[in-house]
A protein has these predicted regions:
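Cytosolic juxtamembrane N-terminal segment immediately preceding the first transmembrane helix
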Residues: 1-32, 36, 52
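Extracytoplasmic
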Residues: 24-52, 136-137, 275-283
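Extracytoplasmic gate region of multi-pass secondary transporters
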Residues: 43-47, 167-168, 172-178, 251-300
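Central cavity-lining transmembrane alpha-helices of secondary-active solute carriers
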Residues: 63-81, 300-312
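Helix-to-loop junctions at the C-terminal end of transmembrane segments
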Residues: 75-88, 309-321, 403-404
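C-terminal ends and interior cores of transmembrane alpha-helices
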Residues: 97-112, 331-344
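Hydrophobic core of transmembrane alpha-helices in multi-pass small-molecule transporters
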Residues: 115-132, 347-361
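Intracellular juxtamembrane helix-capping segments at the cytosolic ends
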Residues: 131-145, 360-375
């Protein structure tokens, strides 16, 4: 089908003189990007902590990520319906409420040492984050002149990258360092009472960090309640602006660039999760004498590369066509994955680490390109794009399967390389559409 657009009224601010009133709302929206990065990246801290505290198998520990993926996957459509009926602001406040409730559940869960209760809390947090992403990503895009939408979203996502780094430091200092992990020989010498007390102390170490998060989330929610956001025509609830979910979906399915964006975002989130999930194992397998503790430094380095890449990418998008920048970044990421697949060793590990710099701008750029010209269907359109986070839960095990079949990790890097190739095709398609 052709690249269909929907003739609707402008999706921008209703009053041209409101540009100055965007500053405070935009700053608050940027804080949301920071907040959901903190919650997402703390999962990597919780996983080893809970695995020791609850004596979990790898599968049971993996339920932490499953709870997140499932929460993210099911909430965007209800969130889109909520915003369709009310406003972006209502979606944001709902997301912050769920975020705070889920984080608050960590206190009683730690007191009673109940892993299931933690998973419920994580699911509620993820539902809140899914709601925030569904609202904040398109809101940032439409909050101002259309020409600056790509730049604003990439700038806001820079705070997301910063939040990821802060989460690792925050988690290491307040969770991992609070109660030192003990080697198995030390644990074997403990009495049952001592072992139980030590395990409980591991779980209790999450209480203070998550209560700090609750306080910050509630403070941001209060600031948003007290802040007047610019009036957007997308929040007009007249009958002419309303449409049912299925009618909206029918229109969306006719829009070629939106369909491609959904596929590209699925591939991106799958590639990102897979690359980061297997980075430490890649280092241990390919570098003789490499320990898991030292290999974790490479994961930290990927976060720094990701932040630098997003910062410089945001500058590039301000000066060049976003789809062209996306095409270049996706192509380089693909080449680096291929290099890590065929070279191995220090060269492959370095390539995999640097790859994060070129992942950086892909999510926000795919998102903003995907929702462009969707008009009244933007809220549902963005909901489906947010749902593609399930790609992380599908591509990662596929990469694991390839690794098991090949007998090594490097060969499995062909999987994210294929994902980046699809993103490159999407970017080139958007480039051709822009020139026609």
């Amino acid at each position: 089908m052709g690249n269909t657009t929907i003739p609707t009224q402008s999706y921008r601010a209703m009053e041209s003189g409101q540009s100055k009133s965007y500053i405070i709302p935009f700053a608050l929206l940027c804080s949301l990007f920071f907040l959901w990065a903190v919650a997402n990246n703390l999962n990597d801290i919780l996983l080893p902590q809970f695995q020791q505290a609850f004596t979990l198998t790898n599968f049971q520990a993996g339920l932490i990520q499953s709870a997140f993926y499932f929460g993210y996957f099911i909430i965007p459509i209800p969130a889109g319906m909520l915003m369709k009926k009310f406003s972006y602001k209502a979606g944001i406040l709902t997301g912050l409420f769920l975020y705070a409730c889920g984080a608050a559940l960590f206190w009683p869960a730690a007191e009673v040492m109940n892993y299931t209760l933690f998973l419920i809390g994580l699911f509620i947090i993820a539902a809140g984050l899914g709601c925030l992403e569904t609202a904040a990503n398109p809101f940032v895009t439409v909050l101002g002149p259309e020409s600056g939408g790509h730049f604003r979203l990439n700038l806001a996502q820079t705070f997301n990258s910063f939040g990821a780094i802060i989460a690792v430091v925050f988690g290491q200092s307040l969770i991992l360092s609070n109660v030192p992990h003990q080697p198995q020989e030390v644990l074997d010498k403990m009495t049952p009472e001592q072992l139980s007390a030590w395990k409980h102390s591991l779980v209790l170490s999450v209480q203070t960090p998550y209560m700090i998060i609750v306080a910050i989330v509630l403070l941001v929610a209060l600031l948003i309640v007290c802040t007047r956001f610019p009036s957007l025509q997308s929040d007009d609830h007249s009958d002419s602006a309303q449409s049912t979910f299925f009618a909206s979906l029918t229109r969306l399915m006719r829009i070629r660039h939106w369909r491609w964006a959904v596929l590209a975002q699925f591939c991106y989130l799958g590639a990102q999760t897979a690359c980061w999930s297997y980075l430490i194992r890649y280092a241990i397998e390919e570098i003789p004498g490499m320990t898991a503790g030292f290999a974790a430094n490479y994961l930290t380095a990927t976060m720094v590369c990701f932040f630098i890449g997003r910062f410089t990418g945001t500058w590039l998008i301000r000066r060049f066509a976003p789809h062209n920048v996306l095409a270049i970044y996706a192509f380089i990421a693909m080449l680096l994955c291929l290099l890590s697949a065929f070279s191995g060793g220090h060269v492959g590990l370095l390539a995999l680490t640097l790859c994060s710099a070129f992942m950086s701008i892909q999510y926000p750029t795919i998102f903003s390109l995907g929702i462009k010209h969707l008009g009244q269907d933007t809220k549902y359109g963005s909901s489906f794009i947010v749902m593609t986070i399930i790609g992380g839960g599908i591509v990662t095990p596929v990469m694991g399967f390839v690794s098991d079949a090949a007998g090594n990790i490097p060969t499995a890097e062909l999987v994210p390389a294929l994902c980046f190739a699809i993103i490159f095709i999407f970017a080139r398609f958007r480039s051709q559409a822009a020139t026609n």
